[in-house]
């Protein structure tokens, strides 16, 4: 029997909804990547005006405060001729296991005015097979 999707994923709000000014880089909280193979950051934006862009960068760092953070992935969403109501941008990164273990996502946009944005981080923990019970005998 399989779990329901929400039971298989670790989903965290890493940036509460807030107005983000145009051309202002805003980072989410850092999440610990140990025990997961991939982390996806899902940014939601109230509206992305026609021809405007949302850019998402993912940073890897040595600790949860962002020490020695470096950009490991970048993606852009651009609205076409029509504005995108309820715009969503998703970027993900594979966690190498031998590098930095803390990750965050940064968003910037060029909408011309403040836009309400929020972010969730989604990860699926590594599969760990059940451990066979051990028989302990003591004299």
Roles of regions detected by a PLM:
Residues 1-139:
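Surface-exposed, low-hydrophobicity beta-strand/loop segments enriched in small/polar/acidic residues
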């Amino acid at each position: 029997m399989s779990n329901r999707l929400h039971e298989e994923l670790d989903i965290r709000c890493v940036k509460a909804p807030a107005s983000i000014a145009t051309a202002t880089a805003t980072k989410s909280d850092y999440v610990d990547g140990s025990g997961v193979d991939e982390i996806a950051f899902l940014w939601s934006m109230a509206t992305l005006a026609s021809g405007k862009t949302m850019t998402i960068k993912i940073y890897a760092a040595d600790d949860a405060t962002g020490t020695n953070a470096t950009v490991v992935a970048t993606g852009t969403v651009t609205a076409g001729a029509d504005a995108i109501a309820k715009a969503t941008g998703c970027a993900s990164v594979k966690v190498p296991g031998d590098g930095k273990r803390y990750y965050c996502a940064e968003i910037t946009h060029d909408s011309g005015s403040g836009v309400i944005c929020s972010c969730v981080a989604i990860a699926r923990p590594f599969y760990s097979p059940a451990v066979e019970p051990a028989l302990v005998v003591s004299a």
